[in-house]
């Protein structure tokens, strides 16, 4: 228990230094409500009418997502498979990625294709990792880049919905390389 508290204080201090008080409080609220209620805070997670990003949810969160018309779910967590716990939706894509690391190119491609398919059908997709601040936003950013946005524009879009995201350096490197590759492919 002491180790858990020390780790929490360390994470909180790091966020305060890097993101400031306001963003850290929003992040803490965004983590606390889902933890205690099992329901993600969708008002912070709606990036577009069909693409949502957020934290892990529990059974009540799954019911809420279904009641809001969600059929597609992307889980970025290597440490937790929604299907093993009965939390998957009608259409489920598990892209196990270690926290704070870049998504593999294979998973990036599969994730983008999965999101694109849902959006093309006019259906909502919920992308999550543990906290909804690193892995899930990274995939969402890559999806928007694949649709022709610049990384800067995609970051603005996602941060407008979820201002406390924190893309780790390896994730940002991946996104920059993906943007360069996507831009080169579009002009070729």
What label would you give each PLM region?
Residues 122-141:
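A phosphate-binding catalytic loop at a beta-strand-loop-alpha-helix junction
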Residues 5-10, 126, 140-141, 157, ...:
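Generic detector of bulky aromatic hydrophobic side chains
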Residues 36-124, 145-179:
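Cysteine-based protein phosphatase catalytic domain of the PTP/DSP
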Residues 180-188:
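C-terminal domain-closing interface element
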Residues 1-36:
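Non-catalytic regulatory/accessory regions that flank a structured catalytic core
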